[in-house]
């Protein structure tokens, strides 16, 4: 039976009455990516090797990817430095809040933001800012941790790595 609610990974991270809808399957995420005009995947440094292998597949499927923090070094080492953007997470958040931002390619802001691998408390603050100040963006946390400030989030799967990777694989299979 599906869980109605998930507890935030950081138990003090209770943002109020509106919390992320729990995602338990990958297909709805893939459908949202396909429907989005401009999806953006934000990748942070808290990523396992297996997660990185999946993120490389998002790059191959022409999803705009931005690496934050030291995550960019993994892409450079894998020969993908030219296909991935780099930004400081806090500055990127400020750009995303501006509906007139032109994006990394000059084509406009993004309507769907997916996040994985960010340090939990950094990602949580980014998602809180988007939730409260960027009505033009839908935010999904496809991370190993439940992020209540996202519109939708995977549950706490940090102890269930295989289950988490299967969800990422489901998304990729549908794209």
From Swiss-Prot:
InterPro entries: CdhB, DHS-like_NAD/FAD-binding_dom. It comes from the Archaea. GO terms for biological process: methanogenesis, from acetate. Signal peptide: none annotated. Part of a complex that catalyzes the reversible cleavage of acetyl-CoA, allowing autotrophic growth from CO(2). The alpha-epsilon subcomponent functions as a carbon monoxide dehydrogenase. The precise role of the epsilon subunit is unclear; it may have a stabilizing role within the alpha(2)epsilon(2) component and/or be involved in electron transfer to FAD during a potential FAD-mediated CO oxidation. Heterotetramer of two alpha and two epsilon subunits. The ACDS complex is made up of alpha, epsilon, beta, gamma and delta subunits with a probable stoichiometry of (alpha(2)epsilon(2))(4)-beta(8)-(gamma(1)delta(1))(8). NCBIfam families: cdhB. Belongs to the CdhB family. This is Acetyl-CoA decarbonylase/synthase complex subunit epsilon 2. It comes from Archaeoglobus fulgidus (strain ATCC 49558 / DSM 4304 / JCM 9628 / NBRC 100126 / VC-16). The gene is cdhB2.
């Amino acid at each position: 039976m599906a869980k109605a609610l998930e507890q935030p990974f950081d138990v003090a991270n209770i943002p109020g009455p509106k919390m992320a809808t729990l995602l338990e399957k990958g297909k709805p995420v893939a459908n949202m990516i396909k429907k989005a005009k401009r999806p953006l995947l934000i990748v942070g440094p808290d990523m396992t090797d297996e997660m990185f292998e999946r993120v490389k597949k998002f790059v191959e499927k022409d999803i705009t990817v931005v690496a934050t923090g030291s995550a960019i070094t993994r892409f450079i080492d894998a020969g993908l430095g030219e296909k991935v953007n780099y930004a400081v997470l806090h500055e990127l958040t400020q750009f995303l809040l501006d509906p007139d931002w032109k994006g990394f390619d000059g084509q406009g802001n993004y309507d769907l933001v997916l996040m994985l691998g960010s340090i939990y408390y950094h990602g949580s603050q980014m998602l809180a800012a988007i939730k409260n100040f960027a009505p033009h963006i839908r935010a999904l946390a496809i991370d190993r941790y439940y992020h209540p400030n996202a519109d939708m989030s995977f549950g706490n799967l940090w102890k269930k790595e295989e289950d988490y990777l299967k969800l990422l694989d489901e998304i990729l299979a549908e794209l």
